[in-house]
């Protein structure tokens, strides 16, 4: 999609916020105000900075001298770093192959490889990652194996790209909300509109969190959570 000459997609890197398709979602705003691009959403719940870093390795050629938006989530900044289980669930062999083929042994490459091994030491190409982490060059045999894997992965991508994607989600979750926004773009007007929507959606609890979240996750047991994060 990022290489499409007939449509301008801008990658938006983030995590769980992309799944909340409210009226102020960047996809809705782009549709409502004809911004000349379509946000290409990258990331979901549990995705963190290291996940995004390896994901970017796959699209470096398409991103060169192009724009991108990177939304940083506060939950990424935790003492222990990224969650290993979450990282492994989002990581793909294609990302690893792309990284190993593009890396040049820089300090950035070495650090990324070390962090990868901390979170996914049993991966299929961990031996090559260990070489990068130590600043060693990959052998001719290593590069030949990576080239072969890349060809296999490209064939898989070509196969799955044949299947059409329904536009129903776009119509239901984006187009309908875009129509509800003011016709003229204004930060002040949209800010007031966001305040109104937020007040309505968080009016059944003292914490001002989503009514649905409170009803399904907190209402029955929130009193028992008192002091649970003080230690």
Predicted segments, located by residue:
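N-terminal hydrophobic targeting segments that direct proteins to the cell envelope
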Residues: 1-5
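Catalytic nucleophile-elbow at a beta strand-turn-alpha helix junction centered on a G-D-S/GDSL motif
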Residues: 7-23
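Short loop/turn segments at strand-loop or loop-helix junctions that form parts
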Residues: 14-15, 70-75, 212-219
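Membrane-embedded segments
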Residues: 18-108
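Secreted/periplasmic serine-hydrolase-like ester/acetyl group-modifying domain
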Residues: 99-231
């Amino acid at each position: 999609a990022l290489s499409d000459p007939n449509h301008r997609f801008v990658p938006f890197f983030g995590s769980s916020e992309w799944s909340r398709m409210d009226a102020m979602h960047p996809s809705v705003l782009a549709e409502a105000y004809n911004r000349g691009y379509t946000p290409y959403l990258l990331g979901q719940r549990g995705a963190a900075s290291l996940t995004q870093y390896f994901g970017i390795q796959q699209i470096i050629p398409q991103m060169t001298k192009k724009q991108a938006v990177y939304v940083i989530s506060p939950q990424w900044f935790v003492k222990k770093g990224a969650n290993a289980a979450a990282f492994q669930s989002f990581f793909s062999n294609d990302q690893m192959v792309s990284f190993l083929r593009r890396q040049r042994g820089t300090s950035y490459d070495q650090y990324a490889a070390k962090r990868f091994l901390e979170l996914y030491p049993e991966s299929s190409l961990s031996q090559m990652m260990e070489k990068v982490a130590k600043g060693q060059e990959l052998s001719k045999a290593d590069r030949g194996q990576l080239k072969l894997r890349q060809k296999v992965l490209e064939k898989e991508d070509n196969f799955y790209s044949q299947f059409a994607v329904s536009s129903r989600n776009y119509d239901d979750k984006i187009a309908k909300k875009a129509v509800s926004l003011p016709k003229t773009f204004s930060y002040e007007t949209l800010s007031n509109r966001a305040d109104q929507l937020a007040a309505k959606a968080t009016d059944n609890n003292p914490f001002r969190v989503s009514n649905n979240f409170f009803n399904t996750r907190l209402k029955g047991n929130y009193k028992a959570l008192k002091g649970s994060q003080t230690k």
